[in-house]
């Protein structure tokens, strides 16, 4: 399994922080030995700078991505999603969705998907429905819009930029790399900050391995 994180200038660090930390560390994986890679993909192999000033050097170019059955294309928020620079990533995302591959997009990346009509027939959310309708001429997906922090469909997760925790939770469930009880405890711990969920998270790691359904 590979997760391809699209890295671009102005990438919104906080929107993917929970998710990339857990995927890279594998600390709560049901099977830590699982064949898994988190790869950074750029428009080119040139380094980019995130909104927080962090430099990212892509492992490969977007044009070189070959999506496998269980792979995920991860699109973080950034200021570039309505520009020509974003087109290669958006076209890859649309093609991936059409072929049943997994895609996750948050904040501005959802606007990019809406702008090419990729959300018209798929359940989704974004920062604001009115903005999608006003700024994306090819958007016809109002009937599929859900006013929720994050929405998971068959092979697509979308989220508002204000919900990085919910976004991460839905993506991790879609990838099925954690046990259900691990995912629940992890999410509730971060959401409520209650001690009981820390103990449940620890306890979940001592049980027989299972995967999310």
Show which residues each predicted segment covers.
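Active-site-adjacent pocket-lining segments in enzyme domains
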Residues: 2-6, 10-12, 18, 25-44, ...
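Short gly/ser/thr-rich secondary-structure transition/capping motifs
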Residues: 52-59
């Amino acid at each position: 399994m590979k997760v391809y994180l699209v890295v671009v200038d102005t990438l919104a660090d906080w929107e993917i922080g929970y998710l990339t930390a857990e995927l890279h560390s594998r600390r709560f994986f049901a099977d830590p030995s699982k064949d898994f890679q988190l790869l950074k993909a750029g428009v080119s192999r040139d380094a980019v700078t995130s909104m927080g000033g962090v430099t990212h050097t892509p492992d490969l170019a977007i044009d070189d991505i070959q999506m496998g059955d269980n792979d995920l294309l991860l699109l973080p928020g950034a200021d570039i999603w309505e520009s020509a620079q974003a087109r290669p990533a958006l076209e890859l995302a649309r093609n991936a969705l059409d072929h049943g591959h997994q895609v996750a997009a948050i904040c501005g990346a959802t606007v990019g998907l809406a702008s090419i009509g990729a959300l018209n027939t798929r359940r989704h959310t974004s920062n604001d429905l009115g903005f999608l309708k006003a700024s994306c001429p090819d958007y016809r997906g109002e009937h599929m819009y859900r006013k929720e922090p994050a929405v998971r469909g068959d092979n697509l997760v979308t989220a508002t930029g204000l919900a990085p925790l919910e976004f991460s939770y839905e993506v991790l469930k879609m990838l099925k790399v954690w046990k259900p009880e691990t995912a629940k405890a992890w999410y509730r711990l971060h959401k409520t900050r209650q001690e009981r969920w820390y103990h449940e998270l620890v306890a979940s790691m001592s049980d027989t391995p299972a995967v999310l359904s």
